[in-house]
Amino acid sequence: MPRETGRKVIASNRKARHDYFIDDVYEAGVSLMGTEVKALRMGRASLVDGFAHIDRGEMWLEGVHIPEYVQGTWTNHTPRRKRKLLLHREEIDRWAGKVRESGLTIVPLALYFLDGRVKVEIGLARGKKNYDKRHALRERQDRREADRAMSERKDR
């Protein structure tokens, strides 16, 4: 069987980009069990309720749902268990300082295979207020209307 190359996205967290301002983005490895990897190869995962936290110098990913592997036996995993993120100590310490001092949170943005290994894209996030969300929605609608008007003008 040939070795996988490239990036294959399994799941993305579009809700996080709607609910938060993303300040910094980083790629981390994920420590998984065998049945979790098999379930991910089937393309099944949900990042919607996911978040990461730092505990005793280690970063953990929680709230991410990876359903049980259908052909799994008694060795199957728990769908919402804590999963350890694989980062260097300096990176964890730097993010811990930012989270502690300014009240930011760490959210998963995407889960993907990179050259056969499971990676998660995590972001340092600051919560949006309702008026920020409405403003972003209004900007998106205005941009869409302008593009539509330009394409109509081009068609004439």
Swiss-Prot record:
Positions of region (Disordered): 135-156
Annotated GO biological process: trans-translation
Keyword entries, A-Z: Cytoplasm, RNA-binding
SUPFAM superfamilies per record: Small protein B (SmpB)
Cellular location(s): Cytoplasm
Top-level taxon of the source organism: Bacteria
One MF term in the entry's GO annotations: RNA binding
HAMAP family named in the record: SmpB (MF_00023)
Function as written in the Swiss-Prot or TrEMBL entry: Required for rescue of stalled ribosomes mediated by trans-translation. Binds to transfer-messenger RNA (tmRNA), required for stable association of tmRNA with ribosomes. tmRNA and SmpB together mimic tRNA shape, replacing the anticodon stem-loop with SmpB. tmRNA is encoded by the ssrA gene; the 2 termini fold to resemble tRNA(Ala) and it encodes a 'tag peptide', a short internal open reading frame. During trans-translation Ala-aminoacylated tmRNA acts like a tRNA, entering the A-site of stalled ribosomes, displacing the stalled mRNA.
Family of this protein: Belongs to the SmpB family.
Protein name: SsrA-binding protein
Originating organism: Kineococcus radiotolerans (strain ATCC BAA-149 / DSM 14245 / SRS30216)
